Amino acid sequence: MLRLFYFSAIIASVILNFVGIIMNLFITVVNCKTWVKSHRISSSDRILFSLGITRFLMLGLFLVNTIYFVSSNTERSVYLSAFFVLCFMFLDSSSVWFVTLLNILYCVKITNFQHSVFLLLKRNISPKIPRLLLACVLISAFTTCLYITLSQASPFPELVTTRNNTSFNISEGILSLVVSLVLSSSLQFIINVTSASLLIHSLRRHIQKMQKNATGFWNPQTEAHVGAMKLMVYFLILYIPYSVATLVQYLPFYAGMDMGTKSICLIFATLYSPGHSVLIIITHPKLKTTAKKILCFKK
């Protein structure tokens, strides 16, 4: 039963990743065409362009790895499997850092906090976006290299099977690997949740203020604010389970977990990228308009 559930989770993840590939290819092409036509691109679209490319490569790599894994006629190589994992880890980390940067940009640009730090960021963050994107890539490369180093230095935990369950013999090296993974994920998690929460709070307060002062409450500006607030709420719903599931998947003793736990982690980890990409498209005016034209919908 658990094997069937795990196999169903793999099929669902393949379908979701295929959808994610199409969505991110769409985001990349639309932003690229805008960039070529106008010879300039906004800070948020620059991040979306980088995010679309990274997720397209990451999800494509996942599909290739899945086909390689389930193929019975292919001789599996340990080194090739490790290469897949490390490349996926680097691309996944880069995409999350790009999303983190995008959330920071939205938080700084949209919120009306008068703190000196917010005012300083509001004035200076847009020109720094190219450098910040490069910093995201370098941080992801560093964390991936750190994972490789600690994995090589730390032997994987030995499985000790008892009558009722399976326990692990965890060394100090394994603990250092786990601590490094938790610390690297925690920084992204704290920044994302904080920026999204601040933006939701600011937008909710702004909408309440408009509702009290305006005679006609529902207008295009209010609709845009509500859309941004919904995007952040749905982002948190997708991001928080994804962060936990991804962290569990990278832990050394993940291989010894039961099929049910692996299936749940796989579904949550896979749902985030395609789901967030769809949210970006339906809340971004230019992407939404282009998508409607492609689908032959009229306004």
UniProtKB/Swiss-Prot annotation:
Key words, A-Z: Cell membrane, Cell projection, Cilium, G-protein coupled receptor, Glycoprotein, Membrane, Receptor, Sensory transduction, Taste, Transducer, Transmembrane, Transmembrane helix
GO molecular function: bitter taste receptor activity; G protein-coupled receptor activity; taste receptor activity
Positions annotated as glycosylated: 164-165, 169
Pfam families: TAS2R
Membrane-spanning intervals of the chain: 10-30, 47-67, 82-102, 132-152, 173-193, 231-251, 263-283
Broad class of where this protein is predominantly found: membrane
Side Extracellular, residues: 1-9, 68-81, 153-172, 252-262
Signal sequence range: none
Expression sites (tissue/organ): Expressed in subsets of taste receptor cells of the tongue and palate epithelium and exclusively in gustducin-positive cells. Expressed on airway ciliated epithelium.
Alphabetical list of InterPro entries matching this protein: TAS2R (IPR007960), TAS2R4 (IPR030055)
Presence of the UniProt keyword Lipid biosynthesis in the record: no
Topology feature Cytoplasmic, residues: 31-46, 103-131, 194-230, 284-299
GO biological process: detection of chemical stimulus involved in sensory perception of bitter taste; respiratory gaseous exchange by respiratory system
Location(s) in or outside the cell: Membrane; Cell projection, Cilium membrane
Membrane topology designation: Multi-pass membrane protein
Keyword Iron attributed: no
GO CC terms: ciliary membrane; membrane; plasma membrane
Similarity remark: Belongs to the G-protein coupled receptor T2R family.
Leftover remarks: Several bitter taste receptors are expressed in a single taste receptor cell.
Reported function: Gustducin-coupled receptor for denatonium and N(6)-propyl-2-thiouracil implicated in the perception of bitter compounds in the oral cavity and the gastrointestinal tract. Signals through PLCB2 and the calcium-regulated cation channel TRPM5. In airway epithelial cells, binding of denatonium increases the intracellular calcium ion concentration and stimulates ciliary beat frequency.
Protein name: Taste receptor type 2 member 4
Organism of derivation: Homo sapiens
